[in-house]
């Protein structure tokens, strides 16, 4: 379906996003806004229209930013075009959030009236303020018996420092107060600005891109200056690639083709782009023949932060896994992978992710959408090394670590973590951060909740920090982080040896102070899981040549003297010595079978 769009004047456009913590009702509010402006017919409405992936709906999180264009007839009789960009709320997708926010001029800050401000709300609000957004505060879930709107308003003013006296009170579930939200968007959020209008050279921000089976890569753009039309030759300023625009349209949330997009408008284009990796979020799109002089600021390619190996449980599934990661890569440029082989687990891929949630989601999508059974090795972060000959090197896999003699220094990434928690759990959380080599930088109270800021090594967080935090605080603490810098650390490579052979999939880089604890835990876990063989199996954790922990799996033995009735003791001695000799030889040549479950359990080992 195609419409000939007459250009909407700038002062009748509002571009906004919704900023909220997980579960505070962001996607439900988006549904209500779509419904009340007639964006979708009743029969097409589904819960969380904008969360199109199953995982997004089930976990109640938004992963990919989505957009929708709504037409709203305001109380003053004018019709406005509202472009809502739905942003992910999770810390792993912080870069996506910052790009989505830079495409808008204002944000709705949605806070649950019963729960108050959470850590991720803070992180995203600060990003919105960095982008000079006008904020409209919306208190959601005011129909709940536990709602305390007045207390939460005070909390917003104390914690975030913005005036919440004129907050809009709504219940997105029942639809209460939705008209007030629409009026607030029109009256309180600013319209987009354009320096040169539609006659200047094209300048557009690439907000997002995804892969469509029929149309190839679809690119979501926000036009700043100039006009984007069908048939135009465009150029990506970050990569220098050129494309011909085949189709221009808007999402309402259905795709509707239009002839062109002008300043302030948000829509999509397709242009025979082969894969999503060619369209980098945050890049500037311009006309190839008449380019704009300056690209938009703030563009940086997404860098993977956490790495882990993914291996198929059944080696025969390797080709299916190769096809599956290739398909996911089409839709997610921040996910990277390369082939790797492990003596214990066979062939698989070393994959890079933006963070732990990203890793979990990719793994779940591979298992779910492609029916694969996978084993993931222990997650590791990217280390920077300076070698003795002066060269700089990045280390993604602990197994590739060069000889200690060649390393001058190793630097690891550090994060700044903000934790919000009810104060009764404060002691346990401080101890957890202390145990993980954290440096406390701030501790403030807001009512009965504490806000703690810590600097922590990312290496200590990727393992199971989040799970431990949730269990200490019974699920009440919220956590948000961003990477600040790389710092030198006393890091050592810990290898696990089974029967004298190193098991590559279990080697990891640890801080020297935590090596004992980690090594002992790993050996004890493996001792429980490796079944007894006919010979005794030593399990050791070693740093370089020094063994720091050891457990032994006892041998099974046959009673070889059972057939001797009485008689000479030397006869029994001879049989026992012969058995001992056999066991010795067996230990030399025997291979230890480590069951798959042992790997999975050892890698999931909780750092108690």
UniProtKB/Swiss-Prot annotation:
Ligand binding (GTP): 23-28, 140-143
Record-listed E.C. numbers: 3.6.5.n1
All residue ranges annotated as the tr-type G domain in the record: 11-193
Keywords from the UniProt entry: Cell inner membrane, Cell membrane, GTP-binding, Hydrolase, Membrane, Nucleotide-binding, Protein biosynthesis
Catalytic reaction list: GTP + H2O = GDP + phosphate + H(+)
Any Pfam family hit: EFG_C
GO cellular component terms attached to this protein's record: plasma membrane
InterPro entries: EF-4 (IPR006297), EFG_III/V (IPR035647), EFG_V-like (IPR000640), EFTu-like_2 (IPR004161), G_TR_CS (IPR031157), LepA_C_sf (IPR038363), LepA_CTD (IPR013842), LepA_IV (IPR035654)
UniProt keyword Membrane present: yes
One GO-annotated biological process of the protein: positive regulation of translation
Localization (cell): Cell inner membrane
Membrane topology value: Peripheral membrane protein
GO MF term list: GTP binding; GTPase activity; guanosine tetraphosphate binding; ribosome binding; translation elongation factor activity
Superkingdom, taxonomy of origin: Bacteria
PANTHER family: TRANSLATION FACTOR GUF1 HOMOLOG, CHLOROPLASTIC, TRANSLATION FACTOR GUF1-RELATED
NCBIfam families noted in UniProt: lepA (TIGR01393), small_GTP (TIGR00231)
Known function: Required for accurate and efficient protein synthesis under certain stress conditions. May act as a fidelity factor of the translation reaction, by catalyzing a one-codon backward translocation of tRNAs on improperly translocated ribosomes. Back-translocation proceeds from a post-translocation (POST) complex to a pre-translocation (PRE) complex, thus giving elongation factor G a second chance to translocate the tRNAs correctly. Binds to ribosomes in a GTP-dependent manner.
Family from the record: Belongs to the TRAFAC class translation factor GTPase superfamily. Classic translation factor GTPase family. LepA subfamily.
Name of the protein in question: Elongation factor 4
Origin species: Agrobacterium fabrum (strain C58 / ATCC 33970)
Lineage: Bacteria, Pseudomonadati, Pseudomonadota, Alphaproteobacteria, Hyphomicrobiales
Gene (UniProt): lepA
């Amino acid at each position: 379906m195609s419409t000939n769009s007459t250009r909407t004047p700038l002062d009748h456009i509002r571009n906004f996003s919704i900023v909220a913590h997980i579960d505070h009702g962001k996607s439900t509010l988006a549904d209500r806004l779509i419904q009340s402006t007639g964006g979708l017919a009743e029969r097409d409405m589904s819960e969380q229209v904008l969360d199109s992936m199953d995982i997004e709906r089930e976990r109640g999180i938004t992963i990919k930013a989505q957009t929708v264009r709504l037409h709203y007839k305001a109380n003053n009789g004018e019709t406005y075009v509202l472009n809502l960009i739905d942003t992910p709320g999770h810390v792993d997708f912080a870069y996506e959030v910052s790009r989505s926010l830079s495409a808008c001029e204002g944000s709705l800050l949605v806070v649950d009236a019963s729960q108050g401000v959470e850590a991720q709300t803070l992180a995203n609000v600060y990003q919105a303020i960095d982008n000079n957004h006008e904020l409209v505060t919306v208190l959601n879930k005011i129909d709940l018996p536990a709602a305390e709107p007045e207390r939460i308003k005070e909390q917003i003013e104390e914690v975030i420092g913005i005036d919440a006296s004129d907050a809009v009170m709504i219940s997105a579930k029942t639809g209460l107060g939705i008209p007030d939200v629409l009026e607030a968007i029109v009256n309180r959020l600013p319209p987009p600005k354009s320096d040169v209008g539609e006659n200047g050279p094209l300048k557009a921000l690439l907000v997002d891109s995804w892969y469509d089976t029929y149309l190839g890569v679809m690119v979501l753009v926000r036009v700043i200056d100039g006009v984007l039309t069908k048939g135009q030759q465009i150029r990506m300023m970050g990569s220098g690639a050129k494309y011909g625009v085949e189709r221009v349209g808007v999402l309402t949330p259905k795709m509707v083709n239009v002839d062109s997009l002008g300043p302030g408008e948000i829509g999509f284009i397709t242009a025979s782009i082969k894969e999503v990796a060619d369209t980098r979020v945050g890049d500037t799109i311009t006309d190839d023949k008449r380019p704009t002089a300056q690209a938009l600021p703030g563009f940086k390619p997404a860098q993977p932060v956490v790495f882990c190996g993914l291996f198929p449980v059944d080696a025969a599934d390797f080709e299916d896994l190769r096809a599956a990661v290739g398909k996911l890569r089409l839709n997610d440029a921040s996910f990277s992978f390369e082939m790797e082989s492990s003596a214990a687990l066979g062939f698989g891929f070393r994959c890079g992710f933006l963070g732990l949630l990203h890793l979990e989601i990719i793994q779940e999508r591979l298992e779910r959408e492609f029916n694969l059974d996978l084993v993931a090795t222990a997650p590791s972060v990217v280390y920077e090394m300076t070698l003795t000959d002066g060269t700089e090197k990045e280390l993604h896999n602990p197994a590739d670590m060069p000889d200690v003699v060649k390393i001058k220094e190793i630097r690891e990434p550090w994060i700044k973590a903000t934790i919000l928690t009810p104060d009764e759990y404060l002691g346990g959380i401080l101890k957890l951060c202390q145990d993980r080599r954290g440096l406390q930088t701030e501790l403030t109270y807001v009512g009965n909740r504490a806000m703690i800021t810590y600097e922590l090594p990312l290496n200590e967080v990727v393992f199971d920090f989040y799970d431990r935090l949730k269990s200490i605080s019974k699920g009440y603490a919220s956590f948000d982080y961003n990477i600040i810098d790389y710092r030198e650390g006393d890091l050592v490579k810990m290898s696990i040896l089974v029967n004298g052979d190193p098991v590559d999939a279990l080697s990891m880089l640890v801080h020297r102070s935590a090596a004992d604890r980690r090594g002992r835990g790993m050996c004890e876990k493996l001792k429980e899981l490796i079944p007894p063989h006919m010979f005794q199996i030593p399990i050791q954790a070693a740093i370089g040549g020094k063994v720091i922990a050891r457990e032994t799996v006892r041998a099974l033995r046959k009673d070889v003297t059972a057939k001797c009735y009485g008689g000479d003791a030397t006869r029994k001695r001879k049989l026992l010595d012969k058995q001992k000799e056999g066991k010795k030889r067996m230990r030399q040549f025997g291979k230890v079978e480590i069951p798959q479950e042992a790997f999975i359990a050892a890698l999931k080992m909780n750092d108690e």
